[in-house]
């Protein structure tokens, strides 16, 4: 059982993100999906379920901004859907593992919507942004009822380029390490306060954004 501390379970928001050289995570208008309107309560995470739909398109093109929903080079060539799922599972387990359990038993369901990391071409030249999008929904662990509404979270992370990327790799801060740590922090904040994870509203720079 994974424990988390007090949170506000008013799950609102819908956002999109793209590729640029900033770090950000935002939430927007609520999805029009039914569910229990939950008050601020302490929750107890009983399970974490991650899905990466097969409909998400994988790109292996070595371009600055390749088309596709999944762009990932931080693991050896293989099933990118499975690799992305493993990253999210590790991040969510780590992000909730140290939190204190509350009174409402829940399952955290996450569906990946976009996982757009940097290609070799971008990483070793100008850098950019890792576009990390996922839909999160809480469900009552015993009744299966929805708790609050699902939200699409944009949890983007600035990706190093050029010499900075080389130095990051040298000290063990690979794309995989940084993205996993970042997602763990995002989910911890999302499940720890009434406003969830909200990053600074920074100007875009470097590569242009891509929806």
Descriptions of predicted regions:
Residues 40, 76, 80-84, 88, ...:
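Extracytoplasmic/periplasmic, Sec-exported soluble proteins
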Residues 15-18:
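C-terminal motif of bacterial Sec signal peptides marking the signal peptidase cleavage site
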Residues 98-147, 159-160, 169:
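Surface-exposed short loop/turn segments
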Residues 20-26, 163-211:
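C-terminal/domain-edge helix-coil "capping" segments
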Residues 63-65, 69-78, 147-189:
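Short secondary-structure boundary motifs at beta->alpha junctions and helix caps
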Residues 79-103, 110:
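Mid-chain, structured segments of secreted extracytoplasmic proteins
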Residues 20-81, 196-211:
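A structural "domain/chain start" motif
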Residues 1-8:
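Bacterial N-terminal signal peptides that target proteins for export
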């Amino acid at each position: 059982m994974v424990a988390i501390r007090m949170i506000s379970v008013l799950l609102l928001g819908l956002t999109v993100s793209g590729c640029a050289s900033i770090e950000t995570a935002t939430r927007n208008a609520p999805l029009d999906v039914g569910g229990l309107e939950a008050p601020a309560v302490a929750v107890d995470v009983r399970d974490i379920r991650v899905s990466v739909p097969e409909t998400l398109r994988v790109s292996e093109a070595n371009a600055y901004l390749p088309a596709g929903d999944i762009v990932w080079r931080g693991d050896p060539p293989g099933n990118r859907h499975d690799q992305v799922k493993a990253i999210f599972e590790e991040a969510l387990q780590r992000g909730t593992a140290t939190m204190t359990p509350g009174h409402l038993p829940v399952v955290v369901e996450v569906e990946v919507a976009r996982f757009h990391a940097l290609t070799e071409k971008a990483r070793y030249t100008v850098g950019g942004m890792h576009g990390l999008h996922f839909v999160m929904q809480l469900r009552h662990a015993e009744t299966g009822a929805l708790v609050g509404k699902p939200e699409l979270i944009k949890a983007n992370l600035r990706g190093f380029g050029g010499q900075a990327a080389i130095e990051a790799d040298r000290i063990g801060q690979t794309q995989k390490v940084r993205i996993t740590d970042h997602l763990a922090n995002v989910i911890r904040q999302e499940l720890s306060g009434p406003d969830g994870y909200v990053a600074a509203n920074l100007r875009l720079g470097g590569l242009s954004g891509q929806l």
